[in-house]
């Protein structure tokens, strides 16, 4: 995938109606502070279009990034922020559930998991939630640069086991620092686009 132009096109809050996009969508889900914004910026070759923050719970909206006028990167609210009150947590959860259930253009969901730790209960719930909505999530194991290379396969196995994910669930280690894993993600996105527009192959 060659990134030519990107823009933040639509921001949806709790009461907003989801846009009726004509281009396909790929969504990015993950707990607060897992590195969603860093991944999206890395994929778009931008430093700060998707705002990163050391403060968890920063993304409280569904943000649609138009990429090359052919695909949307959809940044879903981070979940599992402990300091958010229960009402806010419920609202975020409903936003994510509504999006997964109602989006007509959603083709693929990336679920981000911190490679340093076993998936949390919220991660397991989200993984099952995505699958129940008819999607086979691709796991992006973020913060790859925070562990030694010798630990990578052990941590990937831990993620797979904790999520009870089958061998068909793809797990891609990703580093926001070195961009390791980005080309694999680009190949997946190219495949999604090719499947949607076979005449362009």
Task: Describe each PLM feature range.
Residues 1-83, 194, 200-201:
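Conserved G1/Walker A P-loop phosphate-binding module
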Residues 3-15, 146-201:
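Canonical P-loop GTPase G-domain recognition
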Residues 22-23, 43, 86-89, 124-128, ...:
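Short, glycine/charged-enriched secondary-structure capping and boundary segments
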Residues 58, 71, 78-81, 116-118, ...:
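Conserved nucleotide-binding/hydrolysis micro-motifs of P-loop NTPases
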Residues 65, 142, 185:
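Residue-level signal for inorganic ion chemistry
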Residues 68-106:
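Conserved nucleotide-sensing/catalytic segment adjacent to the nucleotide-binding pocket
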Residues 89-93, 120, 182:
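Amphipathic alpha-helical transducer elements in NTP-driven molecular machines
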Residues 94-169:
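Conserved C-terminal guanine-recognition region of P-loop GTPase G domains, centered on the G4
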